[in-house]
């Protein structure tokens, strides 16, 4: 027997023993087509952010961190993710460590309150134990922890005011994430942590900004999104919302450092049609002629969206089939079709080849 065949035989026996001891799938050949699957995602609820992620949303089986300053839209993005997971028939949980969830606002964003799992834990250990249990159950698709800054260790709560508790929260997060990271990949759940920005004292060079909870979350997170509040959105003299910018500062499933701009309306969440309209204009799918906007359908028909951007956006709200077609074309351009749609297209292609 040649050395090459002998090595192959020994390797096959070793792989077989590993699978017998630790279960099927505990070790695999990466190039095996049956093992390599497209990245499954839960949409973010924003087309612009879906594009920035590079895969069309939050990757399943991974940990995601959304961080930013106060009132920058972190919880809004998390609630939109819950609404999207529920639309797909999934189960979502909200760990309200801040004890600040507004059910009316969540409902306005499309969250089904009747099926939403919610917990308002007494301390950080309890919150993270609940997350771990939900992940290990294997039936929860999305878990949101709002927020890391509010995960106060039990020792700090039970201690007196002014007691020094150095690094307690960082150690808690490090220990919990070691447990959660291993099981989240097997369960195909998405765990989203929202986090706040703090200022480091005495920093002379570089950014003085940092996030709470130590370094563990930065390490274990597959995707980290920085959210910043931009200029206000006005209707006449009244401020009705804010432009927010999102930067993907870490991404293990696609190229990082992409940015997105979206629009949050107070009490309503992301203005999807306004966002869609702006992207369609940038991609030249919607054409401007003077002050009028036009869209040419896949059938070749030119449709007038209206005079001025506000009328064009209203047209998209009144005609969801046109808005849906534009969104599908944009997603197809960026390769963001869902796994189900891609598999359906492959099946249609193979059936066409067989017929021919």
From Swiss-Prot:
Cysteines paired by S-S bonds: none
GO cellular component, one term: cytosol
Gene3D superfamilies cross-referenced by the UniProt entry: P-loop containing nucleotide triphosphate hydrolases
Record's keyword terms, sorted: ATP-binding, Cytoplasm, DNA damage, DNA recombination, DNA repair, DNA-binding, Nucleotide-binding, SOS response
Compartments where found: Cytoplasm
GO biological process entries: DNA recombination; DNA repair; SOS response
Top-rank taxon, per record: Bacteria
Main location: cytoplasm
GO terms assigned for molecular function: ATP binding; ATP hydrolysis activity; ATP-dependent DNA damage sensor activity; damaged DNA binding; single-stranded DNA binding
Residues that, per the record, bind ATP: 68-75
Stated family: Belongs to the RecA family.
HAMAP family hit by this protein: RecA
NCBIfam families cross-referenced by the UniProt entry: tigrfam_recA (TIGR02012)
Function: Can catalyze the hydrolysis of ATP in the presence of single-stranded DNA, the ATP-dependent uptake of single-stranded DNA by duplex DNA, and the ATP-dependent hybridization of homologous single-stranded DNAs. It interacts with LexA causing its activation and leading to its autocatalytic cleavage.
Name this polypeptide is given: Protein RecA
Species for this entry: Thermotoga petrophila (strain ATCC BAA-488 / DSM 13995 / JCM 10881 / RKU-1)
């Amino acid at each position: 027997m040649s050395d090459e065949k002998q090595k192959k035989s020994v390797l096959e026996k070793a792989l077989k023993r590993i699978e017998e001891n630790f279960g099927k799938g505990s070790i695999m050949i990466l190039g095996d087509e049956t093992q390599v699957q497209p990245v499954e995602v839960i949409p973010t609820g924003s087309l612009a952010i879906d594009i920035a992620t590079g895969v069309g949303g939050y990757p399943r089986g991974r940990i995601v961190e959304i961080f930013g300053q106060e009132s920058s839209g972190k919880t809004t993005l998390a609630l939109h993710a819950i609404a999207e997971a529920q639309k797909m028939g999934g189960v979502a949980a909200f760990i309200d460590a801040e004890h600040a969830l507004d059910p009316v606002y969540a409902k306005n964003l499309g969250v089904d309150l009747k099926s939403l799992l919610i917990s308002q834990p007494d301390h950080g250990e309890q919150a993270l134990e609940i997350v771990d249990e939900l992940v290990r159950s294997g039936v929860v698709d999305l878990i949101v922890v709002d927020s890391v800054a509010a995960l106060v260790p039990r020792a700090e709560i039970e201690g007196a005011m002014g007691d020094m508790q150095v690094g307690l929260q960082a150690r808690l997060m490090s220990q919990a994430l070691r447990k959660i990271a291993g099981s989240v990949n097997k369960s195909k759940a998405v765990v989203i942590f929202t986090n706040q920005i703090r200022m480091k004292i005495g920093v002379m060079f570089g950014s003085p900004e940092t996030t709470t909870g130590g370094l563990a979350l930065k390490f274990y997170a597959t995707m980290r999104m920085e959210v910043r509040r931009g200029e206000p959105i006005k209707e006449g003299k009244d401020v009705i919302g804010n432009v927010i910018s999102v930067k993907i500062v870490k991404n293990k499933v696609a190229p990082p450092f992409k940015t997105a701009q979206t629009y949050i309306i107070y009490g309503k969440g992301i203005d999807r049609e306004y966002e869609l309209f702006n992207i369609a204009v940038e991609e030249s799918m919607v054409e401007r002629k003077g002050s009028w906007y036009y869209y040419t359908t896949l059938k070749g028909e030119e449709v007038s969206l209206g005079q001025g951007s506000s009328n064009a956006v209203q047209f998209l709200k009144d005609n969801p089939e046109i808005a849906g077609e534009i969104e599908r074309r944009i997603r197809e351009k960026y390769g963001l079709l869902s796994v189900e749609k891609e598999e359906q297209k492959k099946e249609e292609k193979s059936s066409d080849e067989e017929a021919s």
